[in-house]
Amino acid sequence: MKVYQTNEIKNIALLGNDGSGKTTLTEALLYESGVIKRRGRITAKNTVSDYFPVEQEYGYSVFSTVFHVEWNGKKLNIIDCPGSDDFVGAAMTALNVTDTAILLLNGQYGPEVGTQNHFRYTEKLGKPVIFLVNQLDNEKCDYDQVLEQLKSIYGSKVVPVQYPIATGPNFNSLIDVLLMKKYSWGPDGGEPKIEDIPAEEMEKAKEWNKNLIEAAAEHDEGLMEKFFEKDSLTEDEMREGIRKGLASRGMFPVFCVCAGKDMGVRRLMEFLGNVVPFVSEMPKVHNTRGEVVEPDSNGPTSLYFFKTAVEPHIGDVQYFKVMSGKVHEGDDLTNADRGSKERMAQLFVCAGANRIKVEELCAGDIGCTVKLKDVRTGNTLNGKGAENRFNFIKYPNSKYSRAIKPLNEADTEKLMAVLNRMREEDPTWVIEQSKELRQTIVHGQGEFHLRTLKWRLENNEKLQIKYEEPKIPYRETITKAARADYRHKKQSGGAGQFGEVHLIVEPYYEGMPMPDTYKFNGQEFKINVKGTEEVPLEWGGKLVFVNSIVGGSIDARFMPAILKGIMSRMEQGPLTGSYARDVRVIVYDGKMHPVDSNEISFMLAGRNAFSEAFKNAGPKILEPIYDVEVFVPSDKMGDVMGDLQGRRAMIMGMSSESGYEKLVAKVPLKEMSSYSTALSSLTGGRASFIMKFASYELVPSDVQEKLMKEFESKQDKDE
């Protein structure tokens, strides 16, 4: 295969909602470019994309597919991404290593929730966007309505380059207002018949052509002057204007295809090859030090590894982008993230599961390799003279979590190893072994995300597992001061155990003054601080431990044991066994025995005195609250708001964004357990949401009472 230079390479992400036809379009692109001899079908399970068994089982893309096409001396690297928001990590990864995004739309639905989500990602990254309306042969397709929806959402930057003469089952022709030609196809699609525009379409075509010329001229001062002079531009001038408009996101061209019948695909590739910006024309990339890294094939070599796929009989197939320089088989490189040395194995360019061996890849190109010993997704490999490190991708917070356990306890270690390996394939997985909750928790993007994980574990790894509701990481605290004392005494012949601790607890906040007197039941307790220790708690908040012992009632050597006992109780709070936080403890008195006192005695005395005082100090349970943003169609706003209010949500605000209503709320984590499934059901899959931790807040009194009863009941059963 030819070695393509940087100025011959274009990298494109193919995005779209589930059902928009990305896999079918991929087949048509590969067929038209000669990479495959026959187009596969999803129902036949023989497509280049969706070749993993789990994808064929469910009929949906789960992983991104990297492929390339060669067209008129250009190489187009295209990454076909899953449409479901459950697999958003693949789309975000693809956008970070490509330069242009194609947003594919199902002609019968127009912009959907996936379109909105993907557009937001392109917006954040400043990537050019082409809208591509597919399935024009569907009887419910209304191209004009789709175009109006796009303009309503994204404004005047939406500029059509093509329009169908008719849609529905009889679709077989379109007008291209850049070339001012009619394209038509026979029943099998493929190579079009290109003709002059018929008279009945000429008026509309001229109007749309003028709109396109004006839009193209806006992005180049020289073109604008020519347009004012001649009221027109040549085809090449229009292409140049569109290229600049695309690159600056000042223009979003709209194209038409019927991928299932291979109509319009060849013309799309012509546009991609002729107009879409090259790697070298896009904004410069920066490394983690903020330095510009030029896509220069003559510079030092740097590779960014953005994807790992585990394939049977092969192992890890690792995909990379050449950020600078060139790479060859046998090159010695250094892992900037792990410090290890790597020798590059064979190099390939990709077409799904099929790979073509190449000798060299230049800056800007995308390829894959196998048998690297210590490379992870997100790592950078550098050649001599390069000291780059790239950290492009910030994945979204998890939205759906379940505790996971093997049905056979003996498989626990194997399960953890497999989960960690799978995280290399999909970094949006978060695997948490919670000491606090005593559960292994898998955090993902949705119910379907976890369903595919279960299928893969059971079918690929032969691991039988079950999901459970994850426990909620509640916290416990107090709202007023209280005191208690406790004597630990044990005598069983010989040396015994004795320790007595008197202490005060009170709620603590940063910068809180230290009183010198406390009063309980009419009795005053004067405090003479001898020492203070602030303990930052790994679960949040603080414990402030104050030594106020006077007269030597407790030796200083026993104070660490008292603190240890208190800490052990804070790790298992008295109300529900949850972590306690934000407490100040003042040890002001106690007793020792000259023979029987020891560390264990004072640890137990401190633990029990703290527990008793805590229960008398207005104890409260805190629950995690999350900031939630829901993107919902206007006609479903009332239903979604009502559902959130039923989840104890506090509605913080509403606004319009990208054609959808945005609802902002604070919601207890307990109420978000199956929200992704509920929201999909409520809106017919037309809404999406994001969530992130906000704070801990007091639970309502009825919820606290219920939680305490559940804990007491469990304690009774355990005993």
Where are the language model's segments positioned?
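Structural and coupling elements of P-loop NTPases
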Residues: 1-719
